[in-house]
A protein has these predicted regions:
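Generic start-of-chain signal for non-secretory N-termini
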Residues: 1-20, 27
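Long, highly charged, low-complexity intrinsically disordered interaction regions
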Residues: 4, 56, 62-80, 90, ...
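Short flexible coil/turn linkers enriched for glycine and charged/polar residues
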Residues: 15-16, 28-29, 95-96, 121, ...
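Short, ordered loop/turn segments at secondary-structure junctions
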Residues: 38-40, 129, 239, 321, ...
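Duplex nucleic acid-engaging cores and interfaces of nucleic-acid transaction enzymes
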Residues: 50-53, 60-318, 322-423, 430
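Structured, non-catalytic alpha/beta "coupling" segments that mediate domain-domain communication
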Residues: 74, 88, 99-102, 226-239, ...
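A glycine-rich phosphate-binding loop feature that marks nucleotide/adenosyl-phosphate handling sites
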Residues: 182-189, 319-323, 377-379, 402-409, ...
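Single-stranded RNA-binding regions, centering on S1/OB-family and related RNA-binding modules
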Residues: 543-717
Length: 717
């Protein structure tokens, strides 16, 4: 039997030794970001996505192994565990297969077969099921089991009981279930019909049928939701005449007097027990698969949203639009500190709009506002139009529509109250919107990732699994970027490798009590932050003020000695690194030979390359290499759009059937999957990601339905 490491190595296409090393590191308490970044030699430079896949599968396989032991123990307790059964359980590759093998031994609720066994009909059932050549005719065999005291009045009663027992035995056969399950998933079809006469968003599925292998995840989730709301009735179809021959081949033995009786028992087993059970299993498996796909897509969409390039160092105005309570306004400086707040009412009429423009213009001039961030919620359109009007008198100021999802939840929560105790709840959301433009990652980590809203059907998914996946993405992003130890909030620090909510708060408390951290080493004085946590977190925390320039890089303290040796070897010093005067470091290393230099300074080649990269750009932010967000000074109206126009936009969401693009008209346009590119793709994420800047051609505009159809593939380069 293969070990877990061997199974994972085969699935991931990695050497067994690398997989074993990763398992050992995980078991020692190392985090995925730490392993991905600082233990490359031990796993061949697997990326964080592969490592998370490995971790997920490791958990599944360990649960599978645990369940195998539980099942064997339970069967052994009944005195029925054989060598063959042990081998079958040990080689079962999925939890479903283990449960199939356990099924005959599982304590069941009272079934028709249980009642028949209580009437003493088990021997008759076994006699007929054996289908020996000398087996008597069923009617004759049944005579011996007539017993009115037990409720078996006639031979027909005895045969009915025997049939019930045989049907259950057939239904509990693991090989039969596996074969029919495979047939259903290959050849089955899912059908949904209207359960109501009223129109609804599920009208596409009012008369829908599709082969199971061809079903898209978004179709499964939509059908599930429609069924849950009582608007759809759903069935799984499988050609009975295709399934029964496979079942008969496994059970029926030709030439026996019991053959026809067993054929009938097969049909009863299929119709009454096997098919309803497999239909439930198929629906569950389809839902699980669709959920995993949707969670994966949510994670894929979340990552670029978190890694949006910051627009730092500029005074920014945040506008949280609204009707009843007006438009909330906050002005923050280049570090995110609040300078001013107010409320204006541009939607209350022309006079109030003029007053709002005058008030905001005065604020912009007073504080030297460079950028305006407008939330994309209620009244955003009117607020954007007012802003554009205002900017005609403010040259050099630009604006951007910011996704405000989760801002209201955050502003009303405990975290915002702790951060801004002196500000009204409504004004806190305006501060958050302004900060989202300045540093999206630092602000978005304060919000439950599910509330950011870049997925499909996220409320229908298993929430624990969704949380795990999304928190993993946030963790990967935070650690990939790195965190300033002296300015980061507890929310941001909490996602750093090796830290948790408690140690993150302790860092902030220590900083407030003792002043800025002079270097990384001082972290060891923080309560509850021991050597293991320090090992895991130190490399991801930056201290720009430190006397040691390496404290402002991604070089881990364990590699400081190697970095210093490398600098000496290349004739450079700390000051050269600080001044950015080591541009030719990689060339020097390559000229000397990477393997030779790595050996000389005592690290592996992957670590050497990372150290060189960090020394060449201390304090670098990987987000600065990504396309900058589009800042606008003017706005288009939907009525301005004409088919054939080519516009530049930002990808806001990527889902199974297409891509939503913000083209500056307040209503996102849809690029259907068929219009994403000229070649065939299974999913738009093969081509684009959230945050990408793309050129699109306007295909159609429906003002009544607020729909804009776009194409990427028809844009001529």
């Amino acid at each position: 039997m293969q070990s877990i490491a061997q199974i994972l190595a085969s699935e991931l296409g990695q050497p067994v030794q690398y997989v074993e090393n990763v398992i050992a590191l995980l078991d020692e308490g190392s985090t995925i970001p730490f392993i991905a970044r600082y233990r490359k030699e031990q796993h061949g430079s697997m990326d964080d996505t592969t490592l998370r896949k490995l971790e997920d599968r490791l958990q599944y396989l360990r649960n599978l192994d645990k369940r195998r032991q539980e099942v064997k123990s339970a069967i052994d307790g009944q005195g029925k565990l054989t060598e063959a059964l042990t081998a079958a359980i040990d080689s079962a590759a999925t939890l479903a297969e283990v449960e199939d093998l356990y099924r005959p031994y599982k304590q069941k609720r009272r079934t028709r077969a249980t009642v028949a066994r209580e009437k003493g009909l088990e021997p008759l059932a076994q006699l007929l099921l054996a289908q020996e050549k000398d087996c008597p005719a069923p009617e004759a065999a049944a005579q011996a089991y007539i017993d009115p005291e037990k409720g078996v009045e006639t031979a027909a009663d005895a045969l009915q009981g025997a049939n019930d027992i045989i049907a259950e035995i057939i239904s509990d056969d693991a090989d039969i279930r596996k074969a029919l399950r495979g047939l259903l998933m290959r050849q089955g079809r899912l059908r949904s019909l209207a359960a109501t006469e009223e129109d609804s968003v599920y009208r596409l599925y009012y008369d829908f049928e599709q082969a199971i292998p061809k079903l898209a995840g978004h179709q499964i989730l939509a059908i599930n939701r429609g069924e849950k709301e009582g608007l759809l009735s759903v069935t799984v179809l499988l050609d009975r005449e295709a399934a029964l021959p496979a079942l008969r081949r496994a059970v029926v033995k030709p030439g026996s007097a019991a053959m026809e009786f067993i054929k009938a028992a097969c049909e009863d087993a299929y119709d009454r027990l096997i098919y309803p059970s497999l239909e439930r299993e198929a629906r569950s498996a389809l839902t699980d698969s669709a959920n995993e796909g949707a969670i994966g897509q949510f994670a894929l969409n979340l990552k670029p949203l978190l890694l949006q390039p910051p627009v730092k160092g500029h005074v920014t105005m945040g506008l949280d639009p609204g009707y009843a309570h007006g438009c909330k306004v906050a002005v923050i400086d280049g570090t995110g500190k609040v300078l001013d707040t107010t409320v204006v009412y541009p939607t209350y009429g022309e006079r109030q709009k003029r007053e709002a423009i005058a008030k905001l213009t005065a604020l912009c001039k007073k504080h030297g506002v460079a950028h305006i961030a407008i939330g994309n919620g209620t009244a955003s359109r009117e607020t954007e139009q007012m802003t554009v009007e205002m900017l005609r008198g403010l040259p050099g100021v630009s604006y951007m529509i910011v996704n405000e999802a989760g801002a209201s939840v955050y502003s009303a929560g405990k975290l915002a109250a702790e951060e801004f105790p002196d500000y009204d709840v409504n004004l806190r959301s305006a501060i958050s919107i302004a900060r989202r433009l300045q540093d999206p990652l630092a602000e978005l980590v304060k919000i439950d990732p599910k509330a950011i809203g870049v997925g499909q059907y996220q409320h229908d998914m298993p929430q624990k699994r969704l949380d795990e996946a999304l928190c993993g993405v946030v963790e990967d992003c935070v650690n990939a970027v790195g965190v300033d130890l002296n300015t980061a909030s507890a929310s941001l620090l909490g996602y750093v490798s090796g830290l948790n909510g408690t140690t993150a708060k302790n860092i902030v408390a220590y900083r407030e009590a003792n002043g800025a951290f002079p270097d990384r080493k001082r972290l060891l004085k923080v309560p509850k932050l021991g050597p293991k946590a320090y090992e895991q977190c130190a490399g991801f925390l930056r201290v720009p003020e430190s006397k040691n320039v390496l404290d402002n890089t991604g070089v881990h303290p364990e590699s400081y000695g190697a970095a210093e040796k490398l600098l000496a070897l290349c004739g450079c010093g700390d000051e050269d690194v600080r001044r950015g005067a080591v541009d030719g470091l990689m060339r020097k290393v390559q000229a000397m030979g990477e393997a030779k230099v790595a050996e000389e300074i005592g690290v592996g080649v992957p670590t050497l390359r990372d150290v060189v990269k960090e020394l060449m750009k201390p304090g670098r932010d990987l987000r600065s290499d990504l396309p900058a967000p589009i800042l606008r000074t003017d706005v288009l109206d939907m009525k301005d759009l004409k088919p054939g126009m080519v516009l530049t936009g930002t990808v806001r969401n990527v889902i199974d059937f297409g891509v939503f693009v913000d083209i500056g008209v307040h209503q996102d346009g849809l690029v259907h999957i068929s219009q994403v590119c000229s070649r065939f793709i299974k999913h738009p994420s093969e081509v684009v990601a959230v945050g990408d800047i793309v050129k699109v051609l306007v295909l159609d505009v429906d003002e009544k339905k607020h729909r804009i159809s776009l194409s990427m593939k028809q844009v001529k380069e």
